[in-house]
Structures are given as C-alpha cells and as structure tokens.
C-alpha cells in the first residue's frame, strides 16, 4: 500500500481506492525536462518511465496514450489503428481541461474526464513501470498488471525511435 506521505492528488486517490500496490518517487522537477530527467533523477531506465500523452482525434475527442519515455508516438499509425483521419497532441490548456492536471504532472489516473486509454504494447512486459502520480516532480511505480487492471487500456504498437 502507499506510504502516508504521498501527495493527495486525484491519481493517488484513485490508486488507493483501487487498492493498487504502488511506491512514491518524488524528484526535483525541471521545466521541459521530460522523462529523461525523471529517469536520471530516479536512477531508472527511461524505457520504464511511461509518459501520459493527451491527444485528440479529428473530431476533437480526447484520448490518452501511454508511451515508453524513450519513444515517440506515430500519430499516423495511431489514427489508422483507431479508425480516424488524424490524431494530434492537445494544447496544454486543452489537456488540462480534460485531465485536471498541469502539463508535466499529467497522470492517466483520476482524470477529470473519462477518455479511452491506448497503451504501447511493450509496456505490458516490463517488470515495473514509473508513471506520473498527478503532480510535477512525482512519479509512482507499480507493475504493468496493476495499471492494466485499473485503466483497461487498449494495447497498440505505435512507438517510434525519436
């Protein structure tokens, strides 16, 4: 179970309610540092740090994409898989409106709005993942099975090397 000193974010509330076994990982946040900074600060492989990306389709419907920290999303391939013309990243303001989180502190847990979640398939085979806990400078770690149990993401293969 989580330590009592966890920040109380909507993500942490959902993780506790779902009885997810997670560990806190606070780190010094750097503006525009991304997953390379969090991986470095925590001493973990960037491939195991999962970024939460808020995107929208050509009908302006939002969706969540979970991707390895060292990969980018092929939006063209994602659009093809989900059957839309295009998928694009949301603006920071739009992402915050849908999730309730600031960019850099976006978690797929406890979002303001329910959205479909697409997860890069390779995330499921990792031993442990590190994902944002709903605050800048705060990741939580868990097994991919816990994430899958709670979010029930749709597996996709859309990751590309930057």
Regions found by a protein language model. Give the residues of each.
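Extended, low-hydrophobicity, polar/charged segments
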Residues: 1-162
């Amino acid at each position: 179970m989580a330590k009592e000193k966890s920040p109380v974010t909507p993500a942490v509330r959902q993780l506790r309610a779902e009885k997810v076994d997670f560990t806190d990982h606070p780190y010094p946040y750097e503006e525009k540092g991304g997953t390379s900074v969090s991986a470095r600060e925590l001493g973990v492989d960037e491939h195991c740090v999962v970024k939460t990306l808020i995107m929208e389709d050509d009908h302006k419907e939002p969706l969540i994409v979970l991707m390895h920290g060292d990969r980018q999303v092929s939006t063209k391939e994602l659009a093809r898989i989900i059957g839309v013309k295009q998928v694009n990243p949301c603006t920071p303001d739009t992402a915050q409106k849908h999730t309730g989180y600031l960019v850099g502190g976006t978690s797929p847990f406890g979002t303001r709005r329910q959205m479909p979640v697409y997860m890069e398939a390779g995330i499921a085979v990792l031993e442990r993942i590190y994902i944002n806990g709903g605050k800048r400078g705060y990741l939580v770690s868990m097994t991919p099975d816990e994430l899958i149990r709670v979010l029930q993401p749709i597996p996709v293969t859309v990751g590309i090397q930057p």
